[in-house]
């Protein structure tokens, strides 16, 4: 997208300034932004928000991150606070880096349409997605959050795994791959190797359960991670029952739109909101 409308006069840019969760270099399994999309020379980064998103600059032609017209100037994910253009505060209902980009895009579009910044920030504060990408529920004594991640899209997975790793609360993680795509049938799962599952190798993730038709593909992928406390439970109902009957820690479910209702529609799962 950094190449869209290069040198066009009617372009407005939005972006996130440097924040506490940034890294000095990309940290994923692979690097999408290693080479310049203009001249194909190596790229360098001042900081990285996630994957290839951050302050980039080509070492050859100078293609670089534009100065944003609208910016998230301060971000505190731990306390759920976002400041836009240095003055408008948004309370984050969901404390994830990609949610910040969604908010920032909406803010920029509304400002271009003439809406006052304070009104936008007030409307966006504590906004909860209603499109099913995030669903809270209870299962037994567990409070659960389902994080929809597009299969065949490692960035979607990585950002959700990063969110789980950032919570610092004891939890179980259930990963379901039962259908690869809603649009077509395929059993191709090489995309699992592009996902940084090692993000779950943190002390507060007490248990990782792999379930669904492609649980063995997931298991093979996990054998090449540092995560030790994973197990396979083939059927989704059986996985849910095993979680229901044990413990009360937080529960995070990572799966796609095709598979989400296979869990949420189970009798023991009580959706919230």
Feature map (PLM): residue ranges:
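ATP-dependent carboxylate-amine ligase
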Residues: 30-33, 37-43, 50-65, 108-115, ...
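Short glycine/threonine-rich catalytic loop with a Thr-x-Gly-x-Asp
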Residues: 28-31, 94-105, 131-132
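A short local loop/turn or secondary-structure capping micro-motif enriched for an aromatic residue
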Residues: 21, 100, 153-154
């Amino acid at each position: 997208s950094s190449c869209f409308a290069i040198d066009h006069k009617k372009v407005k840019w939005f972006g996130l300034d440097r924040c506490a969760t940034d890294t000095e270099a990309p940290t994923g399994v692979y690097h999408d932004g290693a080479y310049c999309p203009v001249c194909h020379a190596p790229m360098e980064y001042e900081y990285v928000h996630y994957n290839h998103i951050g302050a980039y600059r080509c070492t050859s032609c100078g293609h670089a991150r534009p100065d944003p017209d609208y910016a998230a100037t301060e971000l505190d994910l731990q306390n759920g606070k976002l400041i836009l253009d240095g003055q408008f505060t948004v309370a984050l209902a969901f404390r994830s880096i990609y949610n910040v980009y969604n908010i920032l895009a909406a803010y920029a579009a509304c400002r271009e349409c003439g809406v006052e910044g304070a009104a936008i920030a007030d409307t966006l504060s504590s906004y909860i997605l209603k499109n099913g990408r995030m669903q809270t529920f209870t299962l037994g004594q567990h409070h659960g959050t389902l994080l929809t991640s597009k299969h065949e899209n490692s960035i979607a997975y990585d950002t959700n795994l990063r969110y789980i790793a950032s919570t610092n609360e004891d939890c179980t993680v259930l990963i379901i791959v039962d259908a690869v795509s809603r649009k077509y049938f395929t059993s191709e799962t090489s995309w699992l190797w592009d996902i940084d599952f090692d993000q779950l190798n943190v002390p507060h993730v007490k248990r990782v359960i792999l379930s669904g038709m492609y649980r063995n593909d997931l298991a093979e992928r996990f054998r090449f991670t540092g995560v030790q406390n994973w197990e396979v439970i083939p059927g989704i109902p059986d996985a849910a029952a095993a979680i229901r009957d044990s413990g009360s820690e937080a529960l995070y479910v990572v799966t796609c739109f095709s598979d989400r209702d296979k869990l949420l529609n189970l009798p023991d799962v009580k959706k919230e909101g």
